[in-house]
Regions:
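Residue(s) in the substrate-gating loop at a strand-loop-helix junction
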Residues: 218
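Catalytic Tyr-X3-Lys loop
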Residues: 168, 175-195, 214, 238
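Conserved glycine-rich cofactor-binding loop
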Residues: 99-100
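Active-site loop immediately N-terminal to the catalytic Tyr-X3-Lys motif
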Residues: 175, 223-229, 251, 295
């Protein structure tokens, strides 16, 4: 405001610093997203290099505050920097099962709304995922989750949104379920969600900035189908888990919610599974996939 008279129509920029020097520790950069912070760090380190070079000859002297203001609020500079703020800008979102149909389509939605997006999945994937990061992680193993969340926190400064999406469908009737099948289903469809949430909550509590955790549960949790108990049992338990987390950690400003998705073609709901589920309900595949009030098939991007 000291220089407002130089450009009375100028709207003040975000006053938060982009570079922070902590004596004895180092230089830190901030931004609305990871890329902005990286650019700020590049500018900062280059500026330091110029200063050091200047001191090797004589001394470094910065331009005046008035000159800085005129440069920062130059109309052409303002036009270059003008951007639309997106609804999730500044957020860091972690999605488990991120390479699956639902996980990846969800990731694209969050990316388009300005969030930093990190995908977790249990397969080796070396291809570049434009605009997103990928970490190989088996979310049924607590130690792997711990390592990955530490890496994400170190790189991005924390997390804000967790979408616990990983899942696995097994069709069995109650009389055909053996211990191995039930253990496998509970491992991915219940315990994996609990492990990821439990460790994420600890990070969100330390950050003291709230947060949001969303579970991909299933219609099976509230409206079970025949011969699908091996999948429905852990999903029904997951619905309870979501409510319990909300009761215990809502006081920290952390929100918990769940989506009860139904009949969506994905790596979980394969053609084979869909065919079996349609047969179990005595329906054609088309009628089964459009079995809702709108009579339309629901797709991952929906």
């Amino acid at each position: 405001n000291r220089n407002k008279h130089l450009n009375k129509n100028a709207q003040m920029h975000d006053p938060n610093p982009r570079l922070i020097v902590v004596k004895g520790i180092g230089l830190f950069a901030t931004g609305k997203n990871f890329n902005e912070a990286k650019i700020a760090m590049d500018v900062g380190t280059n500026a330091l290099s110029v200063m050091i070079d200047a001191f090797s000859y004589n001394k470094f002297k910065s331009i005046s505050e008035k000159e800085i203001f005129c440069m920062e609020y130059w109309p052409l500079e303002l036009a270059k920097l003008k951007k639309t703020n997106l609804s999730l800008q500044g957020n860091v979102t972690v999605i488990s099962g991120g390479l699956g149909a639902i996980g990846y389509k969800t990731a694209l939605k969050f990316l388009n709304e300005g969030s930093e997006v990190i995908l977790l999945d249990n397969i080796k994937y070396n291809k570049n995922i434009k605009g997103m990061s990928y970490f190989e992680c088996d979310v049924t193993i607590e130690s792997e989750i711990n390592k990955v969340l530490k890496k994400i926190s170190e790189k991005y400064g924390g997390i804000d949104i967790i979408i616990s999406n990983a899942g696995f469908a097994i069709q069995r009737s109650l009389e055909d379920i053996d211990k191995l099948i039930l253990d496998k289903s509970f491992a991915i469809n219940f315990f994996a969600h609990h492990y990821l949430t439990q460790q994420s909550v600890e990070i969100l509590k330390r950050q003291s900035t709230g947060g949001s955790i969303l579970f991909n549960i299933s219609k099976q949790a509230v409206n079970p189908g025949v011969n699908f108990a091996s999948y429905g049992l852990p999903k029904a338990t997951l619905l309870f888990l979501m409510k319990q987390y909300a009761l215990e950690f809502g006081k920290y400003g952390i929100r918990f919610n769940g989506i009860n998705a139904d009949r969506i073609k994905s790596g979980l709901m394969t053609k084979k599974i869909i065919s079996k589920r349609a047969k179990a309900r005595g329906l054609s595949i088309n009628d089964y996939m459009s079995g809702n009030l709108l009579k339309k098939e629901v797709k991952p991007e929906d």
